[in-house]
């Protein structure tokens, strides 16, 4: 069916794109989550891939699903949930250049995928 099926988080990474005149960061919203990034790389190398996960039924969730679809990743296993928001990650750099993450999730959709939802997608064989 697929070469690789990934299960995990899909979220939006807000990264510093620039700074305004007062020195405050201007943030850019980027599709994120290691499983989706991994699948996009595999898809680029010719593998067939699919994603299992949950996002909010919001603009960011739609952005994530659309981004995966534009890369050829099967998204039938992604649940869009109107009861929770897509998780947001704010990525900053410390004084040594290492990334630091702060998450906005109370709870985030990525933490709410149930076993039944994952299995109902029909992407995993027993």
What are these language model-derived features?
Residues 48, 52-126:
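Conserved N-terminal subdomain of the carbohydrate kinase-like
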Residues 1-74, 110-115:
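Glycine-rich phosphate/adenosyl-contacting loop at the front of the ribokinase-like
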């Amino acid at each position: 069916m697929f070469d690789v099926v990934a299960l995990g988080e899909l979220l939006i990474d807000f990264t510093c794109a620039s700074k305004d005149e007062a020195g405050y960061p201007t943030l850019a919203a980027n599709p994120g989550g290691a499983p989706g990034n991994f699948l996009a790389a595999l898809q680029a190398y010719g593998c067939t891939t699919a994603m299992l996960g949950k996002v909010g039924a919001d603009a960011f969730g739609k952005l994530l699903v659309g981004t995966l679809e534009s890369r050829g990743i099967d998204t039938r296993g992604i649940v869009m949930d109107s009861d929770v928001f897509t998780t947001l990650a704010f990525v900053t750099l410390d004084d040594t250049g290492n990334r630091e993450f702060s998450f906005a999730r109370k709870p985030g959709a990525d933490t709410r995928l149930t076993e039944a939802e994952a299995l109902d997608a029909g992407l995993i064989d027993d």
